[in-house]
């Protein structure tokens, strides 16, 4: 156990140490400062802009940024949707996998577009290699879009008055070419040399020791898995995701994949400090996020190491902890750490079955996605936290009787209304979706087109855990996470379409909100800092932000958690 805990702590510390220089590098990229890699990437980027006809030097306001962002996403959604819809008739399909039905193609295209990768299919039999390649490219697009949006907000937070906030396409292309692609190559090579396949050949047939023949799925997995973690996307090449022995063969690859999903969310926080030349401010943000992360991960690891009390009452020793649904090559400690890292960061990849997690662990996984403000995904993590900063500044200003100010700009009614709407949107989508599904399940409604049979048919685990499965599905969708309690039968029109709608609303509205707030604040008159200015780089302000997150984000979900994982916890006692 001590060795397992040492491995977990080492991965976390190494990720933080490496994130600081990466954050400095990212800040230089978005500031258009010179870097050592300019001779390599400048010609590539010039070529991309030339063939696309984009003027990367044109300066945009926040509305133009938003228009460019939505346009890119719309184009790639329709292209990917039609490829999935007709993949059975297209090339690069050596295993003859069939085309997707429209509802599943709709859900899958949206899911990869919005950095969620919910995956209501199994990669071995659900998609062709051509579709996998397009989905892999969407993982670059979704991560690059989030980082470009964050870069615009960084620019707006500088100490001046302007509506010129850089160029979206410049931020987007540089995020992909200079950050996502190099890191993905490093991770892909590490996976390739550790046994992860990288081929366009179809299934391989092997003979087992018992003399049976078995078909083994393979494909261009190493490249797909690399960007899935670097871009905090989380979609697995194989159905079992990173629990699959070819997707995550060893403890070393497990450590690499964990580091890969931590590094950019950490680095973006430090990049903000370097970009604004306010490093202490970024340390406060990182400190708040880390405290929140530790409050989630410590109970999870302890719960998994202690095992299942129901099994203990049977007199069975659980020396290795709660091993149901886990891989022996990883163990419960690093698996518990991964489960919180992947839900806090919004990656959504899994190296175990979350449906088999202990109730305390399941509640922490849910709470991580419900809060959706600690670290977060590529770019959008800092945007989610930005909303809570605005609310904390507003509340702090009211408490001391001053007009709220943030980085020299007055926070007024319009900004607060936008921030409040975005903060309320997350629980609204999760709880309303869960209420709808629960209503149908409780009444055993005949679903017709929406589901083959009555609504209780999508629950393999009735009772408290069945409710948790439905709650988890909508929470994962709203947090753009993509992991799931896979006891839920979710590949049907009801779940594909309802979660698809939640995916769209929960991705783009929380991006539009921070962009609008940042754009409005950037246009306001800059007020120099004075003795009465609220300091945002202090521990007191960090505590205030944490309190706002706890009250607005966490407490909103307590009744739902009480009906699901908390009730299940007490039934095991």
UniProtKB/Swiss-Prot annotation:
Keywords from the UniProt entry: Cell inner membrane, Cell membrane, Ion transport, Membrane, Potassium, Potassium transport, Transmembrane, Transmembrane helix, Transport
Residues annotated as transmembrane: 3-23, 72-92, 134-154, 179-199, 256-276, 282-302, 380-400, 418-438, 501-521, 540-560
Cellular localization per UniProt: Cell inner membrane
Top-rank taxon, per record: Bacteria
Membrane disposition: Multi-pass membrane protein
Pfam families (alphabetical): KdpA
Gene Ontology MF: a single term: potassium ion binding
Annotated coiled-coil segments of the chain: none
GO CC terms, sorted: plasma membrane
Assembly and interaction partners: The system is composed of three essential subunits: KdpA, KdpB and KdpC.
Alphabetized HAMAP family for the sequence: KdpA
Reported function: Part of the high-affinity ATP-driven potassium transport (or Kdp) system, which catalyzes the hydrolysis of ATP coupled with the electrogenic transport of potassium into the cytoplasm. This subunit binds the periplasmic potassium ions and delivers the ions to the membrane domain of KdpB through an intramembrane tunnel.
Family: Belongs to the KdpA family.
Protein name from the UniProt record: Potassium-transporting ATPase potassium-binding subunit
Lineage of origin: Bacteria, Pseudomonadati, Bacteroidota, Flavobacteriia, Flavobacteriales
Gene name of the record: kdpA
């Amino acid at each position: 156990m001590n060795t397992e805990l040492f491995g977990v702590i080492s991965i976390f510390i190494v990720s933080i140490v490496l994130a600081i220089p990466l954050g400095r590098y990212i800040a230089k990229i978005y500031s258009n400062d010179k870097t050592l890699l300019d001779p390599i990437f400048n010609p590539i980027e010039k070529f991309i802009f030339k063939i696309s006809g984009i003027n990367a030097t044109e300066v945009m306001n926040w509305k133009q940024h938003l228009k460019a962002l939505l346009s890119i996403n719309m184009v790639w959604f329709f292209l990917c949707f039609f490829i999935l819809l007709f993949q059975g008739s297209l090339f690069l399909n050596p295993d003859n996998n069939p085309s997707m039905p429209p509802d599943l193609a709709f859900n899958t295209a949206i899911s990869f577009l919005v950095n969620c990768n919910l995956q209501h299919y199994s990669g071995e039999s659900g998609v062709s290699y051509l579709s996998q390649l397009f989905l892999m490219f969407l993982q670059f697009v979704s991560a690059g879009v989030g980082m470009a949006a964050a870069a615009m907000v960084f620019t707006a937070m500088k100490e001046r008055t302007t509506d010129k906030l850089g160029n979206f396409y410049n931020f987007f292309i540089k995020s992909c070419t200079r950050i996502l692609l190099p890191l993905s190559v490093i991770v892909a090579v590490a996976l390739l040399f550790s046994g992860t396949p990288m081929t366009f050949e179809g299934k391989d047939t092997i003979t087992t020791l018992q003399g049976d023949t078995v078909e083994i799925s393979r494909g261009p997995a190493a490249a797909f898995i690399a960007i899935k973690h670097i871009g905090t996307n989380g979609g697995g090449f194989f159905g079992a995701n990173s629990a699959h022995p070819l997707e995550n063969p060893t403890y070393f690859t497990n450590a690499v994949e964990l580091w890969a999903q931590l590094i950019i969310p950490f680095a973006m926080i430090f990049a903000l400090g370097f970009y604004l030349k306010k490093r202490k401010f970024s340390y406060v943000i990182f400190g708040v996020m880390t405290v929140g992360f530790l409050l989630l991960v410590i109970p999870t690891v302890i719960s998994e190491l202690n095992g299942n009390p129901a099994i203990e009452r049977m007199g069975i020793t659980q020396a290795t902890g709660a091993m149901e649904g886990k891989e022996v090559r990883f163990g419960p400690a690093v698996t518990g750490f991964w489960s919180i890292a992947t839900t806090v960061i919004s990656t959504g990849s899994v190296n175990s079955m979350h449906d088999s997690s202990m109730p305390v662990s399941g509640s922490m996984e849910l709470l991580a996605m419900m809060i959706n403000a600690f670290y977060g995904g590529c770019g959008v993590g800092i945007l989610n936290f930005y909303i809570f900063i605005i609310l904390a500044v507003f509340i702090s200003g009211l408490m001391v009787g001053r007009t709220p100010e943030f980085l020299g700009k007055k926070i007024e009614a319009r900004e607060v209304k936008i921030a409040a709407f975005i903060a309320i949107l997350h629980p609204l989508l999760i709880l309303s979706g869960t209420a709808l599904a629960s209503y149908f399940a409780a009444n055993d409604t005949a679903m017709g087109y929406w589901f083959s049979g009555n609504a209780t048919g999508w629950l393999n685990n009735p009772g408290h855990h069945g409710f948790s499965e439905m709650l988890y599905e909508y929470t994962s969708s709203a947090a753009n996470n993509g992991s799931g309690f896979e006891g839920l039968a979710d590949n049907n029109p009801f779940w594909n379409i309802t979660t698809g709608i939640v995916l769209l609303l929960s991705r783009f509205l929380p991006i539009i909100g921070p962009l609008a707030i940042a754009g409005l604040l950037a246009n306001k008159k800059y007020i120099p800092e004075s003795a009465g200015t609220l300091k945002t780089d202090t521990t007191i302000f960090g505590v205030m932000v944490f309190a706002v997150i706890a009250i607005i984000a966490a407490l909103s979900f307590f009744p739902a958690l009480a009906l699901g994982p908390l009730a299940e916890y007490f039934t095991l006692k």
